[in-house]
């Protein structure tokens, strides 16, 4: 700052001189502090009386002048200079009592009042610099006493002022610290200690010196911390029963010290045997009285003043005593048949010299017991435990100080040693990740303790032992591989057995015993392979030169593949007298194992023997030699090849050709455009986990060199594979097998898909075909013996149930063909063909009281047939309403004699021969099966066509009933009922009555059975009645013989009851099976018996029925409806139950029929069709 002011003043002065004015003079005045100095000023004229003027003294940095004198007036003085300044000899200023702060620039000015030119106001002035010299004085100092914690930093600062400026230095314990060193640094008068230690405590002196004098300041530094032991304890040796003292003294700040003593890390006051014999003195020493053998050991002194981490010092106390027995067991077990030891527990200091034994109170003579000897510690060793060892023993030990006495007596017992019950196998092979159980159990007396241990490096937390002492390795890991020992130990003996565990499916284990033999510019590396993990393993040798500089510790390793099966490798091309690191790596298909330990070796140099003189060559050397030193290196970027150029090059090297191969395959050219200037190349397109071999060939002009040395490299574990097309011909066999397998699988999958699609299409077509068949007209049964619809009715071929076959329905819909009196239609091959839409005949369908159907052949009259042909376009619902009923009932519901009207559409042949009355025909028996009780009343029924339709009588004409009845009249004498039953009429002679038809036979049974069954037991035969009808199954007539035989139950093998005899009523071409059931009962209790009662039951109920028969009253015709002329058969008595309900139903139907007939009578014949086909329910 001062020199800046000086430069400013000088610049002002120079600027004034540059204006052409008089150059002022600069005066320097030096004074000492406390003395006086005169600042000269000669601006006044030297002679004469000066004009009126004003004298001013200005100090640079002050706003106002420090001194102003005008004439004879009192001067104006600055307060800092009051009493210390005055004028002397003109305008000079005298300053008394100089101070350091008075130093600076002063200017003298004289203003003449008679001069009014403003340019000359400051012309009369001069500058004076006052320098005040003073001795050094401290402006800032550290405290006299400073406390600092140990390991903390501290700063001591000294600042001194003076003129000239003083120089500050520091001293510690009288030694100049200079600029400092280590933890102490001195800079610009400041002392800085980075880390205060115990030795940093002391006096630090700060000294400020200059030409005017020097000054000093001293600071005492106190370090707060744990104590420092200045007198540690020393090792000591005493005899037993003597006193001993161990010294310990420490220093610390603060000095509130507390001493503690420990024996073997236990406070001496916490040991019961020492509490009464130990003292700690004021100076920290330990006093121990009457020492004992147990007092020997390490004693530690620990002083403390409250700060953490107190110091400690230890010493060992040795106590000398005679040999003595510690604890002799009362019993000593020995193993039977094994080596045993009788121990004598002895302690002695000085050491033990010998031990004497007694057996059974007598001195033991070992020469009398072969195999007995003394152990190194005086124990008695018995080679074979037997009865000779039994007895009581005592021992007496001796050392240089003598003996403390004999031991108590111990009795020897013979015990069974541990013996293994379940021994592990010698070897175990198991896959990694699975569980392995190795049994091991032992017995003995006392029972032994079984334990497992792994030889070498053990497992932590992976091995478990179950309750049977078996070793469990769950899961099995790679670390479990090795040798395991099972040991059994008890008080008698200790036995072990071992086994080897081989863990399969892992990477190889580390190789062992790696050795390197140095060779000239090479090394021979050998090793012992580890376990291969269950797969074939291969090895590679890795080496690298040792880093010569620490800053380049990272370097690339070079690997060389080892031939398969070899356990050594010669590494060539090493630099002589250079230290190399070698390691061996094992690999298999699952990966790489750990590297072996690193071995260091220094290859040797070439021998210095003189070379043999070379003979003149007979052949010209090749003009181009091969590349040298080809090496493959694994780098983070991939596989990198290094090589040296050929030694012999003709003129210019054009390039290299890189060749490679896998294993023993042929050489392939990988790159033939490598530049001749290159000495390294990154090989692209390599495959993972493959062993490669590379070589180089150089070419120049027309010359091609021999191949270079082969460099081996494996890509196992390589993370980066340069992306390029795979090398030709180097596709691995596993990859090729996978590709071929994938293609084969794809082909098989496509073939199976095509076959499946074909099969699904065929199934779908079959389903559509079956669906069309279901949508086609329903199927009916037809006997096999009929060749066509025009077969003769008198065919001799029997029709059994096994000869029925399925045929297509000849009509589009059953409901359209169920018309009363519709003429027969020829069968049609297809429902949509015009030929298949013609009318078909439909016979009347009746239903008896038991709910079974009666079907009779009928043919519509000619005139009705013509009408039907004309009205064919009508809907089938109207034709369905045309129905016929052959039964009648009285209005009162009482059963009346049935009048059978001959409505058969088949006329009698012109020359029909009389024939016996046939038995029940096949259709009648078929309709009497329980199956037809399941048929839907309102279901569709197919038309039944006849071969030759004849002109039938009128549709509802009143025809006479057959003159001959099936049963004798009621008033006739009783005869053999079995002869008059329908089933027994086969043997009756020729009858002149009209031919027996199925309708007549069925009507007979409908009229006779209700009366008979009413008195029959409910449980007769096989009744399967239920609330809504019985569930029956279609089956042929029963072959079980009944009590007396009847037409209801034909004899076994009698198939004539189905279809036999020359004279039969026309057979039914079709029988429709109806699968849909519907409740047709009047109420919930409407039911039918599932079977007819037996013959004996019929005979029992037959006579009462005949006795109670009466004449059927004549029915009143209603609404012009024709009634039958005669009543036939017999009357039955009224029976409650189902018969009454049937009568009620019959009355309802008769009322409906009367209404229908009345309506039909009013209409023409061709228009008599029912408007409500749904009401045409067949009963």
Curated annotation (Swiss-Prot):
Domain Ig-like: 24-124, 136-216, 226-318, 322-410, 418-498
Residues spanning the membrane: 735-755
Domain (Fibronectin type-III): residue spans on this chain: 507-611, 623-718
Gene Ontology CC annotations of this record: axon; dendrite; glutamatergic synapse; inhibitory synapse; neuron projection; postsynaptic density membrane
Keyword Phosphoprotein: yes
Signal sequence segment: 1-20
Positions of short motif PDZ-binding: 1177-1179
UniProt cross-references to CDD domains, sorted A to Z: FN3
Tissue expr: Expressed in hippocampal neurons (at protein level).
Predominant location: membrane
Entry-linked SUPFAM superfamilies: Fibronectin type III, Immunoglobulin
Gene Ontology MF terms in the entry: cell-cell adhesion mediator activity
Extracellular side: 21-734
Subcellular location: Cell membrane; Synapse
Topology of the protein relative to the lipid bilayer: Single-pass type I membrane protein
PROSITE patterns xrefs: FN3 (PS50853), IG_LIKE (PS50835)
Disulphides: 41-108, 158-206, 248-301, 344-395, 440-486
Positions annotated with a glycan in the UniProt record: 188, 513, 524
Function: Functions in dendrite outgrowth and synapse maturation.
Family statement: Belongs to the immunoglobulin superfamily. Turtle family.
Domain observations: The PDZ-binding motif mediates interactions with MAGI2 and SHANK1.
Protein name: Protein turtle homolog A
UniProt source species: Rattus norvegicus
Upper classification of the organism: Eukaryota, Metazoa, Chordata, Craniata, Vertebrata
Protein encoded by which gene: Igsf9
């Amino acid at each position: 700052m001062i020199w800046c002011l000086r430069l400013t003043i000088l610049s002002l002065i120079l600027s004034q001189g540059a204006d052409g004015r008089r150059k002022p003079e600069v005066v320097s005045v030096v004074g000492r502090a406390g003395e006086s100095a005169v600042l000269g000023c000669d601006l006044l004229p030297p002679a004469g009386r000066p004009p009126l003027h004003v004298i001013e003294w200005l100090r640079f940095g002050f706003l106002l002048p420090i001194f102003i004198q005008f004439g004879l007036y009192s001067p104006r003085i600055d307060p800092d200079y009051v009493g210390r300044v005055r004028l002397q000899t003109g305008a000079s200023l005298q300053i008394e009592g100089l101070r350091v702060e008075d130093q600076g620039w002063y200017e003298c000015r004289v203003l003449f009042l008679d001069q009014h030119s403003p340019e000359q106001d400051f012309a009369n002035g001069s500058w004076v610099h006052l320098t005040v010299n003073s001795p050094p004085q401290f402006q800032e100092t550290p405290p006299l006493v400073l406390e600092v914690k140990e390991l903390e930093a501290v700063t001591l600062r000294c600042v001194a002022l003076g003129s000239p400026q003083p120089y500050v230095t520091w001293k510690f314990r009288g030694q100049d610290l200079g600029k400092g060193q280590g933890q102490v640094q001195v800079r610009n008068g400041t002392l800085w200690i980075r880390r205060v230690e115990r030795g940093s405590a002391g006096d630090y002196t700060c000294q400020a010196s200059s030409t005017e004098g020097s000054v000093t300041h001293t600071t005492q530094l106190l370090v707060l911390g744990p104590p420092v032991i200045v007198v540690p304890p020393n090792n000591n040796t005493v005899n037993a029963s003597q006193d001993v003292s161990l010294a310990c003294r420490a220093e610390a700040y603060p000095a509130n010290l507390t001493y503690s003593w420990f024996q073997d890390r236990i406070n001496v006051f916490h040991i019961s045997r020492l509490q009464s014999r130990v003292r700690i003195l004021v100076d920290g020493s330990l006093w121990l009285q009457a020492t004992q053998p147990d007092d020997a050991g390490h004693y530690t002194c620990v002083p403390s003043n409250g700060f953490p981490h107190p110091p400690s010092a230890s010493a060992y106390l040795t106590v000398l005593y005679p040999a003595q027995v510690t604890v002799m067991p009362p019993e000593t077990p020995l193993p039977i048949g094994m080596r045993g030891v009788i121990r004598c527990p002895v302690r002695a200091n000085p050491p033990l010299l010998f031990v004497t034994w007694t057996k059974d109170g007598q001195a033991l003579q070992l020469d009398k017991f072969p195999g007995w000897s003394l152990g190194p510690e005086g124990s008695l060793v018995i080679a074979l435990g037997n009865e000779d060892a039994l007895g009581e023993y005592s021992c007496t030990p001796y050392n240089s100080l003598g003996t403390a006495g004999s031991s108590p007596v111990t009795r020897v017992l013979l015990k069974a040693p541990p013996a293994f019950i379940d021994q592990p196998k010698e070897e175990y092979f198991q896959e990694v990740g699975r569980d392995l159980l190795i049994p091991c159990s032992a017995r003995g007396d006392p029972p032994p303790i079984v334990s497992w241990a792994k030889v070498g490096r053990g497992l932590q937390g992976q091995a478990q032992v179950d309750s049977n002492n078996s070793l469990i390795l769950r899961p099995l890991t790679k670390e479990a591989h090795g040798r395991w020992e099972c040991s059994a130990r008890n008080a008698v003996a200790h036995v072990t057995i071992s086994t080897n565990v081989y863990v399969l499916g892992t990477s190889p284990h580390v190789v062992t015993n790696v050795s390197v033999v140095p060779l000239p510019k090479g090394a021979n590396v050998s090793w012992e392979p580890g376990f291969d993990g269950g797969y074939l393993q291969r090895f590679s040798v890795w080496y690298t030169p040792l880093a010569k500089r620490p800053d380049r510790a990272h370097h690339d390793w070079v690997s060389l593949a080892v031939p398969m099966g070899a356990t050594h490798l010669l590494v060539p091309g090493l630099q002589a007298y250079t230290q190399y690191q070698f390691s061996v790596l094992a690999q298999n298909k699952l990966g790489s194992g750990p590297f072996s330990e690193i071995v260091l070796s220094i290859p040797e140099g070439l021998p210095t023997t003189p070379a043999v003189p070379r003979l003149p060559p007979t052949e010209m050397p090749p003009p181009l030699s091969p590349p040298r030193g080809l090496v493959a290196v694994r780098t983070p970027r991939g596989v990198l090849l290094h090589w040296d150029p050929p030694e012999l090059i003709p003129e210019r090297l054009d390039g290299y050709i890189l060749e490679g191969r896998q294993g023993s395959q042929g050489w392939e050219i990988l790159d033939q455009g490598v530049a001749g200037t290159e000495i390294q190349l990154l090989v692209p397109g390599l495959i993972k986990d493959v062993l490669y071999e590379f070589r180089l060939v150089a070419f120049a002009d027309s010359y091609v060199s021999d191949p270079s040395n082969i460099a081996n490299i494996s890509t196992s574990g390589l993370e980066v594979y340069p992306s390029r097309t795979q090398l030709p011909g180097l596709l691995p066999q596993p990859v090729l097998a996978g590709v071929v397998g994938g293609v084969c699988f794809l082909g098989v999958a496509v073939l199976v898909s095509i076959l499946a699609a074909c099969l699904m299409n065929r199934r779908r077509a079959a389903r559509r075909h079956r669906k069309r068949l279901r949508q086609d007209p329903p199927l009916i049964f037809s006997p096999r013996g009929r060749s066509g619809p025009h077969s003769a009715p008198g065919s001799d071929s029997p029709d059994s149930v096994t000869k029925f076959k399925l045929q297509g329905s000849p009509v589009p819909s059953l409901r359209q063909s169920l018309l009363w009196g519709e003429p027969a239609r020829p069968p049609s091959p297809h429902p949509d063909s015009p030929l298949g839409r013609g009318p078909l005949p439909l016979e009347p369908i009746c239903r008896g009281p038991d709910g079974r159907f009666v079907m009779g052949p009928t043919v519509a009259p000619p005139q009705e047939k013509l009408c039907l042909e004309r009205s064919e376009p009508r809907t089938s619902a109207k034709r369905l309403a045309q129905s016929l009923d052959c039964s009648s009932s009285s209005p009162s519901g009482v059963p009346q004699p049935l009048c059978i009207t001959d409505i058969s559409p088949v006329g009698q042949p012109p020359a029909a021969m009389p024939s016996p009355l046939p038995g029940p025909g096949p259709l009648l028996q078929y309709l009497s099966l329980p199956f037809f009780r399941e048929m839907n009343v309102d279901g569709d029924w197919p038309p039944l066509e006849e071969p030759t339709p004849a002109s039938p009588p009128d549709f509802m004409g009143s025809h006479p009933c057959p003159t001959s009845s099936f049963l004798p009249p009621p008033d006739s004498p009783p005869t053999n009922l079995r002869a008059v039953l329908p089933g027994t009429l086969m043997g009756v002679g020729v009858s002149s009555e009209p031919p027996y038809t199925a309708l007549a036979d069925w009507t007979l049974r409908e009229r006779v059975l209700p009366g008979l069954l009413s008195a029959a037991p409910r449980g007769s035969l096989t009744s399967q009645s239920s609330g809504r009808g019985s569930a029956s199954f279609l089956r042929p007539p029963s072959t079980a013989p009944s009590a007396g035989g009847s037409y209801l139950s034909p004899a076994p093998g009698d198939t004539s009851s189905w279809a036999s005899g020359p004279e039969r009523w026309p057979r039914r071409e079709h029988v429709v099976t109806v699968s849909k059931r519907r409740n047709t009962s009047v109420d919930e209790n409407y039911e039918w018996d599932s079977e007819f009662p037996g013959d004996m039951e019929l005979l029992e109920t037959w006579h009462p029925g005949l006795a109670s028969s009466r004449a059927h009253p004549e029915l009143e015709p209603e609404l012009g409806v024709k009634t039958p002329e005669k009543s036939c058969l017999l009357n039955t008595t009224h029976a409650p139950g189902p018969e009454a309900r049937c009568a009620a139903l019959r009355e309802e139907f008769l009322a409906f029929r009367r209404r229908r007939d009345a309506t039909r009578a009013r209409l023409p014949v061709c228009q008599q069709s029912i408007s409500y086909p749904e009401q045409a329910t067949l009963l």
